[in-house]
Amino acid sequence: ESDTSFSINSLMKLGELAQDDEGDIKTLAFSQARFATATNAEGSTTNLGLGIRHRPNDVSMVGGNVFLDYRMTDYSDAHSRLGLGGEYLWKDFEFRNNWYMAITDEKAVTVKGVNYKEKVVDGWDVEIGYRLPNNPELALFVRGFNWDYKYTQDNSGLEGAVSWQATPYVGLEAWVSNEISAVSTTLNSKLPKTDETFFGLRMNLTGSPVIFGKKDYKKNMITQMTQPVKRKYDVLLERSTGTFQNRAKSDA
């Protein structure tokens, strides 16, 4: 079973706080808003964020951000989550770290006449990326993650991805991972086993061109300053009966 999600994402410049000697942006404060829904999602997700990015020189960029993630459902009150993130880019390398923390408590919900417990799953991730110097529209990413479930085993593992900026307005990313999808909410007893692997394709259409120059690090850093933050926007929810569910690989 697969989910198809749709989202609209907007980054707004709040202020160019500093420029370099050539008049190019050096420090940027920005806000970000995103709305998403999906097949089988039972609702929608809104993300609101604030961030700052700074170029200390022509070959690097450092940034920090904070997000409020709001998961609305058609069967109960909304869930909310706080996100904190940091990023560091140097030449062809990219490093990111994000933390996701529940704001709302565990709650009782009724879905199709059945009572469950439901809560936001806390988690974190770390990502390392490498952009090919002679083909900067191509990048490779490895991301480690952990999602802290309460009534079943945690979801920990890796995601590998290949990203391709096919045109200035179209970006594609193919990925493989053992990460449980947060697009829709699944009862713990119906979650994948701990040894299962998934793959997928992401497509990003942009209104403004995204252009990377060959070994032109300054230009590439300026391009990255106005790109949406890379993080998990979907709010992962745990739905359970309140008893522990073993999802370990069976010996059979």
What are these regions (language model features)?
Residues 67, 75, 81-108, 113-117, ...:
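Hydrophobic, helix-prone linear segments
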